[in-house]
Amino acid sequence: MSFFDYSNQYDYPIFFEECKVPQQTKIFRELINKYHSYVKYSDVPQRRINYLIYRTSDSKVIGAIGISSCVLAISVRDNYIGWDKETRLKNSNMVANNYRFCLAPDNGIKNVGTMALKLLRIEGGKRWKEKYGDDLVMLETFVQPFRDDSDNKRNGAVYLADNWSMVGKTKGTSIKKAPVSLWQREDSTRGELSRKDPEAAIKKYAVGREHYVVTKSPIKKVFLKPLNKKWKRMLNA
C-alpha cells in the first residue's frame, strides 16, 4: 500500500498538476532553469510527462518534476535488472527516467522532497499507463555529485531517503542524435571529421535511419526504484 491514500489529494501538503498546455510547460521550464543547478531544460522527442508541484495551503507552485523514456543502455542498471540486449529493447518502455526534479528553497514543507517522489510513483505510474499503454515498473534517475559529496542536493540524499538504490555510476559517456553535418559524410572521412568536431571523436553509428554520436559526459550516480514487488520477473519476461 502506498504511503499516501490519494483518494483526496488535498489532505496532503502538496499536489501535482500535469503540464498539458504551453503556459504550464513554460512555467515548468522556468522552474527547472532557475532551481535545477546543473542541468537546464531541453525538449527531446520521447515519452515525457511533466508535473508542476503545488503547495496545498495556498496553491502556490513550489517545484517541478518529470519522467521520460529511460536511458537507452547503461551497464549498471541493465546488470541490476538482469537485462540482455534483446530483453532490454523489449521491456525498456516499462522503465521511466525521473529526468528532472527541483523545488523552490524555503517552501515551508518538511520532507517535501520524499513526498514529491511518492506522489510521482502514484501519479506517474497511473498516467504512464493511460498515456502510453505500458505498466510502469521501475524509475531511474542520475545525479551528478560534487567531488566530495558535500551538498545533499547533489549527492542524491532525497532519493536515498525515499529508499531508492544507488546501483553504481555511469562511465562518463552518453549517446545523442548526431547533427546532420556528422553523418552526411562517408566513413572514410571520419578521421578528418573527428579533428574538426570533437563530438565525432569517440564514435558515431546508425540505427535504421537515425544517426548517433557517443560523447563524453560527467560521471553520475545511478539510482533505481522498483514500483512493483514482481519487478524483476516483469522486466525479464
Predicted ranges, named:
Residues 1-3, 32, 150:
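Polar low-complexity intrinsically disordered regions
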Residues 25-49:
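Short, basic/aromatic recognition patches
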Residues 10-11, 32, 202:
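Generic signal for short, ordered secondary-structure residues
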Residues 1-22:
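Conserved N-terminal entry element of GNAT/NAT acetyltransferase domains
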Residues 17-18, 22, 26-27, 47-49, ...:
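Acyl-donor binding region in acyl/amide transferases
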Residues 232-237:
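Flexible, glycine-/basic-rich loop-and-beta segments that form/coincide
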Residues 33-36, 227, 231:
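Generic secondary-structure transition motif, activating predominantly at the C-termini of alpha-helices
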